[in-house]
Amino acid sequence: MKNKSTLAKLLSEEDINVVHKQMETAYFDSKKRELGLPIWKDEDMTKDIYDLMVCHEIGHALWTPLDMLEKAALRKINHSFVNIIEDARIERFVKNKYAGSVGVFVRGYTELVAKDFFGTKGKDINSFNLIDRINLYYKGSKDMVFADDEKVFVERTGNTETFEEVCELAEEIHAFMKEQKEKREQEKIDDTD
């Protein structure tokens, strides 16, 4: 674990504090500059999953603003929407900066899906809401179906450059999903008349 901690510090280009704890997933605390990695059973925490978590979290260390949560809260943006889009942005940046990480992400997410980490086993992921499908798409589930008006959001998620763009897109996706829900509810009312 010491070698992995050193690697995380090198990749993040700073002397971040790396801690290992009993928890469900990894995190990066932007203010404390702390990368937390979970301690799982050996058969659950493979090298590829561990490396994926390190690569993902150092992306937050390098590119996520310190005040991300505060900025999103001030704008009353749903945190999970911001986090999903920000995850796609920082993972793209990590892959561009560290070419060897591309395989790490593919192998790690493949293993997490196989372990049902995302809770999708036996479910029709195409029935999930848009933001959850975008999340799964950028975690490697490329066989998902998106409507034409949704594809724009999927593409934009993969092209965000700044945190401001992340916030704007989160607001737009949230508004779109709300509008779609209202349309479906109105259609149900119309069908019963």
Could you describe each region identified by the protein language model?
Residues 1-193:
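Short, functionally important secondary-structure microenvironments
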